Amino acid sequence: FFFKQNTAYEIGVRLVGSEMCIRDSPATVTIIGGGVVGYNAIEIALGMQANVTVLDKSAKRLDYLESVFGDDLNAVPANSESNETFITAADLLIGAVLVPGASAPKIISRDVLKKMKPGSVFVDVAIDQGGCSETSRPTTHSNPTYIEEGVLHYCVSNMPGAVPLTSTYALNQATLPYIEDLANQGLIQALTEDLGFCQGLSVHQGKITIKVCLLYTSPSPRDGLLSRMPSSA
């Protein structure tokens, strides 16, 4: 617990200052990836009155984020030029890149990262998928940070483990409705009536039903595996 608190304090001091020396300007936060992790990072950073930029390849996702956060958020299409511009300007850089079923791409090169301001912070949430920077390596809750090229790196695998009780409660709350549907409706009916649930199915009847795998079989209730099965299966 001490290590977790100490790490949070250390990062916080770098971003907003301490009780003895408060920053005279808002921190600059750059978030790479506008998915679920990126969305929540934006919320927290804006709540800390930071200047926030999110980089994402999807124009549709950027439009959505702008519709939610308005002018408070700087939403920028991700490319090599914009990535370098906003990475090197950041006080806090958050890697929130996820490619389902694959290792995270190395979006951040060492050459770009070394241009960041000394004492800046990099949090690689993608470390569970290998990390999105050439400078990333997995760390632990007991030894969470290291400095590389003058930048403080936080690359802890399984970050929710820092707050195990809270994260377990949140996971239970998120999964309970699906468990109740399975119990009340049975597998086939639950999957048939909930498209999102069906898309989360990975293996069924000896078939791989997740698209990122090569030997993929569609589980779609319309024309896939589930459409060929009796409702009592």
Model feature map: region roles:
Residues 1-17, 22, 216-233:
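Single conserved hydrophobic/aromatic residue that forms the stacking wall/gate
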Residues 18, 127, 132-215:
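Adenosine-phosphate binding glycine-rich loop
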Residues 18, 23-90, 95:
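Glycine-rich phosphate/diphosphate-binding loop of Rossmann-like nucleotide-binding domains
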Residues 41, 104-105, 132-134, 165, ...:
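Short glycine-/acidic-enriched loop or helix-start segments at secondary-structure transitions
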Residues 59, 127-131, 223:
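Short, glycine/acidic-enriched loop or turn micro-motifs at the edges of active sites
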Residues 69-149:
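Rossmann-like adenosine-cofactor binding region
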